Amino acid sequence: MSLTYMNMLLAFMISLMGLLMYRSHMMSSLLCLEGMMLSLFVMMTVTILNTHMTLASMLPIILLVFAACEAALGLSLLVMVSTTYGMDYVQNLNLLQC
């Protein structure tokens, strides 16, 4: 296993641990999710480049599209919760139900 894979796996694991440990604030959860997506993107891109899989070269772009959609939805939810309640606690998401 090369050093690049080890670093990206370490970045993914640190982001996952951050998501599991610091889930009280929504902003920290969103940052951890973005870190996970970034490490997955780099691992996928390096794997495709190393194996010369030309048919799978669009997969990292598709992952980035989904990551951008996730970030937009997460930030809009963060803005809605913070303007409604004045704080970004994840526990306020249960209060948004009708």
Curated annotation (Swiss-Prot):
Its EC number is 7.1.1.2. GO terms for biological process: ATP synthesis coupled electron transport. It is found in: Mitochondrion inner membrane. The chain crosses the membrane at residues 1-21, 29-49, 61-81. It catalyses: a ubiquinone + NADH + 5 H(+)(in) = a ubiquinol + NAD(+) + 4 H(+)(out). Keywords: Electron transport, Membrane, Mitochondrion, Mitochondrion inner membrane, NAD, Respiratory chain, Translocase, Transmembrane, Transmembrane helix, Transport, Ubiquinone. Its main location: mitochondrion. InterPro entries: NADH_UbQ_OxRdtase_chain4L/K, NUOK/Mnh_C1-like. The keyword Protein biosynthesis does not apply. GO terms for cellular component: mitochondrial inner membrane; respiratory chain complex I. It is a multi-pass membrane protein. It is an enzyme of class 7 (translocase). GO terms for molecular function: NADH dehydrogenase (ubiquinone) activity. Core subunit of respiratory chain NADH dehydrogenase (Complex I) which is composed of 45 different subunits. Core subunit of the mitochondrial membrane respiratory chain NADH dehydrogenase (Complex I) which catalyzes electron transfer from NADH through the respiratory chain, using ubiquinone as an electron acceptor. Part of the enzyme membrane arm which is embedded in the lipid bilayer and involved in proton translocation. Belongs to the complex I subunit 4L family. This is NADH-ubiquinone oxidoreductase chain 4L. It comes from Sturnira lilium (Lesser yellow-shouldered bat). The lineage of its organism: Eukaryota, Metazoa, Chordata, Craniata, Vertebrata.
